[in-house]
């Protein structure tokens, strides 16, 4: 089913993914790094693709990030993205860096492209070395397909504690040409970006250069991936990469292009969709939480308040317990570090107004409990009545299963 977004000239393709844009193929296989599941994959483009990336701000960064940064820095283009899961190749010293370079070299040889057109990344357990014989033999076996099956195989190959695959696809019109933006992601725990434990790979056939693509991705990341949190931990490895083949043959996109807003909106919706899927699949989670803040001093502060609320363990556990404890919400607002007038705050949980101008409303606890049990996503709305700033953030409830999953992660 296709769904039209009424606020922009954008169409959502419910069955699309990272192979939907012209020029892209994908593959995922099992090599033996994991016991049973697929653990190695690649996205490949027919042509060198303008590329942009945003990386974790964790000061301890895994070796593959350095290699990918170096590749993109040469021409601002990539043609292949190689990913393994199960082992993160983080905190592995010179050997780990050499292994990442080897992955890049073998990928270039396999796909018959220059090394600087290859990016690599890894996700999994920190502090273990990659079994390079297994990895290099696996890379040589990769045979990407320009099919939805190839996209699903790739997505499966990059998952760790995820319970579901995460795909998205949108289309828009630029110069009368159909432009497609598709993507996949992984992420379930250790999610608290400035980029954090997540990988997201987005492809598009739009004609756009590296600089303008990087500018768009950086801005959109701050509004999407950097607005999700599961557990407050920021990873060593993770990144968002966008590759643009240019095969839609539109006139080169710049912010001055008359259809720039169409492309930007499609990319924004794709990233937001993937971000929300990651939050919804938080380890042990039973539902998505969406917090919208209005009336803040500015958009940045609105986003900060929203993320503070959705990241509060007390708020998350209250949602899991179907407890409309708005006191936990206002507490998170107060320690957000943003401008707040404690006498003008409105809070609503779904349609139920719990606080008006910082005074309790005498709402029905039964109605609130029923909403929290049935709603997914659970929506929390806050109006600070300070200014015109607006922002959203996404997260999930916190359950007993989160502890169970993470207590046994390496076993």
Swiss-Prot record:
Signal peptide: none annotated. Feedback inhibition by L-ornithine. Catalyzes two activities which are involved in the cyclic version of arginine biosynthesis: the synthesis of N-acetylglutamate from glutamate and acetyl-CoA as the acetyl donor, and of ornithine by transacetylation between N(2)-acetylornithine and glutamate. GO terms for molecular function: glutamate N-acetyltransferase activity; L-glutamate N-acetyltransferase activity. This is Arginine biosynthesis bifunctional protein ArgJ. The lineage of its organism: Bacteria, Bacillati, Bacillota, Bacilli, Bacillales. The keyword Transferase applies. CDD domains: OAT. The record marks 123-124 as: Involved in the stabilization of negative charge on the oxyanion by the formation of the oxyanion hole. One of its GO terms (biological process) is L-arginine biosynthetic process. Heterotetramer of two alpha and two beta chains. The active site is at 197 (nucleophile). Belongs to the ArgJ family. One of its GO terms (cellular component) is cytoplasm. The record marks 196-197 as: Cleavage. Pathway: Amino-acid biosynthesis; L-arginine biosynthesis; L-ornithine and N-acetyl-L-glutamate from L-glutamate and N(2)-acetyl-L-ornithine (cyclic): step 1/1; Amino-acid biosynthesis; L-arginine biosynthesis; N(2)-acetyl-L-ornithine from L-glutamate: step 1/4. NCBIfam families: ArgJ, PRK05388.1. Its main location: cytoplasm. InterPro entries: Arg_biosynth_ArgJ (IPR002813), ArgJ-like_dom_sf (IPR016117), ArgJ_beta_C (IPR042195). It comes from the Bacteria. Its EC number is 2.3.1.35, 2.3.1.1. Pfam families: ArgJ. It catalyses: N(2)-acetyl-L-ornithine + L-glutamate = N-acetyl-L-glutamate + L-ornithine; L-glutamate + acetyl-CoA = N-acetyl-L-glutamate + CoA + H(+). The keyword Acyltransferase applies.
């Amino acid at each position: 089913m296709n769904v039209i977004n009424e606020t922009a000239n954008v169409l959502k393709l419910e069955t699309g993914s990272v192979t939907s844009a012209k020029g892209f193929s994908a593959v995922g296989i099992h090599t033996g790094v994991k016991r049973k599941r697929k653990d190695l994959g690649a996205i490949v483009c027919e042509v060198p693709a303008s590329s942009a990336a945003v990386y974790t701000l964790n000061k301890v960064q895994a070796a593959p990030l350095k290699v990918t940064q170096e590749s993109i820095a040469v021409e601002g283009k990539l043609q292949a993205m190689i990913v393994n899961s199960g082992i993160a190749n983080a905190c592995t010293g010179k050997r780990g860096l050499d292994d990442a370079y080897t992955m890049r070299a073998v990928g270039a040889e396999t796909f018959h492209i220059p090394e600087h057109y290859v990016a690599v990344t890894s996700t999994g357990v920190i502090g273990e070395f990659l079994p390079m014989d297994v990895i290099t033999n696996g890379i040589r076996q990769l045979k990407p397909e320009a099919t939805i099956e190839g996209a699903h195989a790739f997505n499966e190959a990059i998952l760790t504690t995820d319970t579901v695959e995460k795909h998205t696809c949108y289309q828009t019109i630029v110069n009368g040409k159909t432009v497609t933006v598709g993507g996949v992601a992984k992420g379930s725990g250790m999610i608290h970006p400035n980029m954090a434990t997540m990988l997201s790979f987005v492809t598009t056939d739009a004609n756009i250069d590296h600089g303008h693509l990087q500018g768009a991705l950086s801005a959109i990341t701050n509004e999407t991936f950097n607005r999700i949190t599961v557990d407050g931990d920021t990873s060593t490895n993770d990144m968002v990469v966008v590759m643009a083949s240019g095969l839609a043959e539109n006139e080169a996109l710049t912010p001055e292009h008359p259809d720039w807003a169409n492309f930007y909106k499609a990319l924004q919706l794709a990233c937001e969709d993937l971000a929300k899927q990651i939050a919804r699949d938080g380890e042990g989670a039973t539902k998505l939480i969406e917090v919208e803040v209005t009336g803040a001093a500015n958009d940045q502060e609105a986003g900060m308040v929203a993320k503070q609320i959705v990241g509060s363990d007390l708020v998350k556990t209250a949602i899991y317990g179907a407890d409309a404890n708005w006191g936990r919400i206002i507490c998170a607002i107060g320690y957000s570090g943003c401008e707040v007038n404690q006498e003008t705050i409105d809070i609503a949980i779904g349609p139920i107004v719990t606080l008006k101008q910082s005074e309790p409303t005498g709402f029905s606890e039964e109605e609130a409990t029923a909403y929290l049990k049935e709603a997914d996503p659970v929506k929390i709305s806050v109006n600070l009545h300070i200014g015109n700033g607006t922002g959203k953030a996404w997260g999930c409830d916190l359950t007993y299963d989160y502890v169970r999953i993470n207590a046994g992660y390496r076993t």
